[in-house]
């Protein structure tokens, strides 16, 4: 849970929000969760919150949802481009042994979520 708090704080900083209001924090966390689900839906299995591209994707998604600086469309388009890249990259669309502890290639029950 600590990593999620860190990610929430990164998003708060990216949005230039200094308020620690519970309502704003909840909205940021909802956006983070929605982004992760969206990435999973296109086949991204490796959602490491310390990975620079995953953090960037979440940042773009959150900025689009919050309409940051009136550039929601720009951020949404950038997010979609990165989402496509992540979904096609074997680094992100496969689960490694270190992620799961077992080899899951070809196994139906090896997917995240669901």
Region annotations inferred by a language model:
Residues 45-52, 57-71:
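Mid-chain, well-packed structural core segment of small domains
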Residues 1-54, 77, 88-114:
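Conserved short "hinge" loops at termini or chain/domain junctions
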Residues 64-88:
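C-terminal structural segments of small proteins and small subunits
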